């Protein structure tokens, strides 16, 4: 900033903006530290994988994999976990990622497949597909919270990786923006549920819509909120059929809409959480049985531990 800028904004404002710019530079340097460390170990390019819609009771599960360039001049300003960004910022950063990434891949798993596989299995399946769909084969894969078995590349899970690793943050943005756009399209098809507002997650308004209209084909029957709404709707129809005012309905016992075999609702379908740890520290693969290396990792996890 030159003298004219200082005169226009004032010294205090200029100092504040300089501090803000410096803080953002340091944040980005820190966000890319995993890619730098892996590059020093000869492991590049690095893919980051994350999903959107895991906890929603309607709509698809979307998984993205992204490989960013390692050149510091190619860093994406403002990149962060999608949950920390405004919708407008996500859209802007999404466009930057798509235009500047070495490779990216998106997998959309419909609600019917989520019900069939279960949320956790669908998530892992989507991660495998997303990595396999990359045009550039990664030398290493970093995931947010869950490791992926069966890849051709070694990989590790990072606690809160979408907050701590650039390529995972990029994947979180791509997955989130893609899914939000799909939910807006579903809103046009099923406007009574207001999917464009809550994006398929459980809210008071979404519960009220389910109570009024029952589930639509985009709702996940494996989630207890949806099953209960479906059961109430079946009961209401049966009560109408049994009443004298509705002779046109066939009578019969009330039946709740079942979920898929073996499902126990959203609580049990939710995936096991990653081992506890501060954001940006790799999960200890020896202490977390289901968060372990793929078996073909030639370097121990400790090599990537960063204080």
UniProtKB/Swiss-Prot annotation:
A divalent metal cation binds at residues 50-51, 144. It is found in: Cytoplasm. Manganese or magnesium. Binds 1 divalent metal ion per monomer in the absence of substrate. May bind a second metal ion after substrate binding. Its EC number is 3.1.26.4. Keywords: Cytoplasm, Endonuclease, Hydrolase, Manganese, Metal-binding, Nuclease. PROSITE patterns: RNASE_H_2. One of its GO terms (molecular function) is manganese ion binding. Residues 44-235 form the RNase H type-2 domain. One of its GO terms (cellular component) is cytoplasm. InterPro entries: RNase_HII, RNase_HII/HIII, RNase_HII/HIII_dom, RNaseH-like_sf, RNaseH_sf. Residues 287-296 have a biased composition (Basic and acidic residues). Pfam families: RNase_HII. Its cofactor is Mn(2+); Mg(2+). GO terms for biological process: DNA replication, removal of RNA primer; mismatch repair. Transmembrane segments: none annotated. Residues 250-280 have a biased composition (Low complexity). SUPFAM superfamilies: Ribonuclease H-like. Residues 241-307 are annotated as: Disordered. It is an enzyme of class 3 (hydrolase). Its main location: cytoplasm. Belongs to the RNase HII family. This is Ribonuclease HII. It comes from Acidothermus cellulolyticus (strain ATCC 43068 / DSM 8971 / 11B).
């Amino acid at each position: 900033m030159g003298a004219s800028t200082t005169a226009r904004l004032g010294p205090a404002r200029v100092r504040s903006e300089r501090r803000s710019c410096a803080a953002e530079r340091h944040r980005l340097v820190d966000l890319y530290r995993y890619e730098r460390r892996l590059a020093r170990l000869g492991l590049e390019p690095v893919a980051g994988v994350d999903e959107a819609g895991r906890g929603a009771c309607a709509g698809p599960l979307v998984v993205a994999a992204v490989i960013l360039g390692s050149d510091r001049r190619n860093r994406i300003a403002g990149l962060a976990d999608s949950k920390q960004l405004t919708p407008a910022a996500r859209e802007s950063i999404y466009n930057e990622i798509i235009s500047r990434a070495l490779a990216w891949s998106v997998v959309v798993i419909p609600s019917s497949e989520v019900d069939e596989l279960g949320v956790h299995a669908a998530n892992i399946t989507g991660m495998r597909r997303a990595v396999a769909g990359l045009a550039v084969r990664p030398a290493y894969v970093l995931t947010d919270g869950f490791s992926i078995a069966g890849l051709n590349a070694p990989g590790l899970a990072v606690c809160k990786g979408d907050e701590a690793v650039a390529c995972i943050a990029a994947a979180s943005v791509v997955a989130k923006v893609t899914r939000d756009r799909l939910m807006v399209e579903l809103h046009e098809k099923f406007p009574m549920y207001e999917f464009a507002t809550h994006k398929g997650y459980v809210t008071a308004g979404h519960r009220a819509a389910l109570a009024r209209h029952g589930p639509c084909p985009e709702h996940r029957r494996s989630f207890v909120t949806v099953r209960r709404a479906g059961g109430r709707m079946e009961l209401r129809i049966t009560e109408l059929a049994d009443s004298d005012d509705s002779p046109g309905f066939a009578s019969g016992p009330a039946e709740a809409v079942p979920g898929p075999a073996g499902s126990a609702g959203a609580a049990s379908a939710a995936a096991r959480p990653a081992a506890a740890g501060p954001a940006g520290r790799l999960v200890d693969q020896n202490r977390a049985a289901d968060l372990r290396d793929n078996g073909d990792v030639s370097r121990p996890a400790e090599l990537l531990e960063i204080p």
